[in-house]
From Swiss-Prot:
Its main location: nucleus. This is Protein LIGHT-DEPENDENT SHORT HYPOCOTYLS 9. Belongs to the plant homeotic and developmental regulators ALOG protein family. Residues 160-169 have a biased composition (Basic residues). Coiled coil: none annotated. Residues 37-165 form the ALOG domain. Residues 181-191 have a biased composition (Polar residues). Probable transcription regulator that acts as a developmental regulator by promoting cell growth in response to light. It is found in: Nucleus. Pfam families: ALOG_dom. GO terms for biological process: mRNA transcription; post-embryonic plant morphogenesis. The keyword tRNA processing does not apply. GO terms for molecular function: DNA binding.
Length: 191
């Protein structure tokens, strides 16, 4: 037997040695993967919404809010917006590039609100909010509000909203061709 081999010794329970496993030191926290930009923004948005609920008089619990509180949150956010939205009475109403300043308010852009609702909808479900059917962020009134905001901002700014067409990728075309090729019988010929 070699002398450099260490044989474990039994220590009495009241005198543990430094090599024993009686007192496990906590492992240092494992470095977490940094959150993606989307996940970081979703967490920030959720925390902002929760803080908004707590600031209400009386403060609201997560189980107490509904779509009306979501709508009031969206209106509250307008004060921090950076998009000029002209009133109908403004001389620059409907002009995309007004030649001068006006006193019309800055509001949240429709696209920002739409993305925010998407992130909050996902965050609500992640925080145990229940089924997508009961998600206040997915309520039809929220969709109607967003549509109205989009249309009014498009008119006020003179920039019509056009839905971007989705391009088909090569893979989609190949799949379609494969489906057509696979649907024919082996004995059939195309002439």
């Amino acid at each position: 037997m070699s002398s450099d081999r260490h044989t474990p010794t039994k220590d009495p329970p009241d005198h543990p040695s430094s090599s024993s496993n009686h007192h496990k030191q906590p492992l240092p926290p494992q470095p977490q993967q940094p959150l993606s930009r989307y996940e970081s923004q979703k967490r920030r948005d959720w925390n902002t919404f929760v803080q908004y609920l707590k600031s209400q008089n009386p403060p609201l619990m997560m189980s107490q809010f509904d779509y009306t509180h979501v709508l009031s949150f969206l209106r509250y956010l307008d004060q921090f917006g950076k998009t000029k939205v002209h009133h109908q009475a403004c001389v620059f109403f409907g002009q995309p590039d007004p030649p001068g300043p006006c006193t019309c308010p800055l509001k949240q852009a429709w696209g920002s609100l739409d993305a925010l609702i998407g992130r909050l909808r996902a965050a609500y479900e992640e925080h145990g909010g229940g089924s997508p059917d009961t998600n206040p962020f997915a309520n039809g009134s929220i969709r109607v509000h967003l549509r109205e905001v989009r249309e009014s901002q498009a008119k006020a700014r003179g920039i019509p909203y056009r839905k971007k067409k989705r391009r088909k990728t090569k893979n989609e075309v190949v799949v379609v061709k494969k489906d057509v090729a696979n649907s024919s019988t082996p004995n059939q010929s195309f002439t």
